Amino acid sequence: SSMFVWNTKLILKTCGTXL
């Protein structure tokens, strides 16, 4: 559960940087 949240935040951060 905790890892799922961490991965979600990482994906959002990557997408934000990316864009």
UniProtKB/Swiss-Prot annotation:
The keyword Nuclease does not apply. The keyword ATP-binding does not apply. Its EC number is 4.1.1.50. Induction: Stimulated by putrescine. Inhibited by aromatic diamidines berenil, pentamidine, propamidine, hydroxystilbamidine, by ethidium bromide and methylglyoxal. The active site is at 1 (schiff-base intermediate with substrate), 15 (proton donor). The modification Pyruvic acid (Ser) is found at residue 1. It catalyses: S-adenosyl-L-methionine + H(+) = S-adenosyl 3-(methylsulfanyl)propylamine + CO2. Pathway: Amine and polyamine biosynthesis; S-adenosylmethioninamine biosynthesis; S-adenosylmethioninamine from S-adenosyl-L-methionine: step 1/1. It comes from the Eukaryota. InterPro entries: AdoMetDC-like (IPR048283), S-AdoMet_deCO2ase_core (IPR016067). S-adenosylmethionine decarboxylase is essential for the biosynthesis of spermine and spermidine. The alpha subunit contains the active site. Belongs to the eukaryotic AdoMetDC family. Heterotetramer of two alpha and two beta chains. This is S-adenosylmethionine decarboxylase subunit alpha.
